[in-house]
A protein has these predicted regions:
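Re-entrant/interfacial helical elements at transmembrane boundaries that shape
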Residues: 83, 114-126, 154-164, 331-344, ...
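Short helix-coil transition sites and intra-membrane helix breaks within transmembrane domains
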Residues: 60, 72-82, 107-118, 147-154, ...
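Alpha-helical transmembrane segments of multi-pass membrane proteins
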Residues: 95-107, 131-149, 174, 180, ...
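Hydrophobic transmembrane alpha-helices of multi-pass solute/ion transporters
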Residues: 1-70, 83-87, 225-307
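Membrane-core helix-loop-helix motifs of multi-pass transport proteins
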Residues: 129-218, 352-354, 374-410
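Membrane-interfacial loop-to-helix junctions in multi-pass transporters
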Residues: 1-4, 55-61, 87-100, 129-136, ...
């Protein structure tokens, strides 16, 4: 009964998401199914929910999502990102590398519609290379997401580290060779057949190059500050982001505009930038995870797998991929799958290899999902063919899965 309840809950979450319901409503409906199927008493329901809401993981992730999305919108609306893009375009003359770096930089900062922000910049470089619209869409979405497997401020990676026994750095170290190979494959695939002879303009003079580099670093300084505070000084993530917010509030003030007016508008950008939908979704996912852990379903799954000698590796590859692909949401794939698999995995480093592979396969499914918002928005911007784009991004998604499996096998059996 409990196992059937979880299967129904996951199916309900997927169907409701595809029907246009907000993710957090879909997950709350799934929680209700788990509660009914497990016959939790009112006292148990309140105890689990209260414990989940006051847990350090819940508090940390909620604060991270609130502060990071507000920070991203502030960077966008204050003009800092625009300065970054213009300076980078002046420094990097090869249109191919512009198409790689511009979406990657935009992707470092979390704000809704980021794919649309980088799309015009990618389009300008793409026209120089005579790329078709579909290829430009693939470049914009692929290079926007490619660094997330090693980016320490990526919410999906932070969620993995918070709800599993392994650290952020464990995942980054496992993913690093996969990232490097996937970058190479993606670059070759996107720019296959492209000739750049005669398209690369002359470089800037030393003084101009220095000025543009200073502008670039200045515009990115709040983000650089956050990363340094976290990686070097091990500062609590939400506090580090707040320091970055304070830095973003004071840089690139417009000349000739009253100070109070600029300060007021930037505070407004900050408040309006909070992505409450993502915040509520994180809260719902963590509550769902805790109800799963308190149910008997995990033991039922373990019993079924042991009785049928079903390979865990196959499930780790397909279940997260399918969940992310159908829902177009990496949070849901990670939040649903990680609690199910942790009890099934071997302890120590071998368990890490499974968890890292789970993360990569969920990213591959999310990357190629037909309801992934970045795909939808970019296709709409370029007026591109949906089937062609989905074919290309899912070819790259399949490559990511294969590279993840290869890394797993090498680490598991050879190292």
């Amino acid at each position: 009964m409990e196992l059937i309840g979880v299967l129904v809950a996951v199916a309900l979450i997927i169907v409701m998401t595809q029907k246009g319901f907000k993710l957090y409503w879909s997950i709350l409906a799934g929680i209700a199914v788990v509660i009914v199927s497990n016959r939790f008493s009112l006292e148990e329901i309140l105890s689990i929910a209260y414990g989940s809401l006051r847990s350090p993981t819940m508090i940390t992730l909620t604060l991270i999502v609130i502060t990071l999305t507000a920070f991203g919108n502030l960077m966008k609306e204050s003009g800092s990102l625009r300065v970054t893009m213009l300076s980078l375009s002046s420094l990097v003359k090869d249109p191919r590398y512009q198409m790689v770096i511009l979406p990657m930089l935009i992707g470092l900062i979390t704000f809704p519609g980021g794919a649309v922000f980088s799309a015009p910049l990618v389009e300008e470089a793409g026209h120089k290379l005579k790329l078709n619209r579909e290829r430009m869409v693939v470049a914009n979405t692929a290079f926007r997401h490619i660094q997330y497997m090693i980016y320490p401020l990526y919410p999906g990676l932070l969620l993995m580290a918070e709800i599993s026994p392994y650290s952020l750095y464990d995942y980054i170290l496992f993913n690093l060779p996969v990232f490097m190979l996937f970058c190479l494959v993606t670059f070759k695939y996107v720019f296959r057949g492209v000739k750049v002879t005669g398209l690369i303009e002359g470089g800037l003079e030393d003084n101009n190059r220095r000025n543009e580099l200073i502008k670039l670093l200045s515009s990115l300084s709040p983000l650089i500050l956050i990363v340094l505070l976290v990686l070097i000084f091990n500062l609590y993530f939400p506090v580090a982001i707040m320091v970055g917010v304070l830095a973003a509030l004071v840089i690139n003030y417009p000349v000739g505009k009253p100070l109070w007016e600029t300060a007021r508008s930037r505070l407004n950008y900050l408040v309006k930038g909070i992505n409450w939908s993502m915040t509520f979704s994180i809260i719902a996912i963590l509550i769902f995870k805790d109800f799963l852990e308190q149910s008997k379903v995990i033991y039922d799954i373990m019993a079924v797998m042991m009785e049928n000698n079903f390979p865990v590796l196959v499930l780790v590859v397909f279940l997260p991929f399918l969940t992310a692909f159908l829902m177009g949401n990496y949070f849901a794939a990670v939040g649903i799958c990680v609690p199910l698999f942790i009890p099934l995995l071997p302890p120590g480093e071998q368990g890490l290899y499974y968890m890292a592979l789970l993360f990569l396969t969920s990213q591959a499914g999310y990357f190629g999902s037909p309801i992934h918002m970045c795909n939808i928005l970019t296709i709409e911007h370029f007026k591109a063919s949906l089937p062609t784009v989905l074919k290309d991004v899912n070819i790259l998604g399949a490559v990511l899965v294969l590279l993840g499996i290869a890394a797993f096998l090498v680490r598991f059996y050879l190292l």
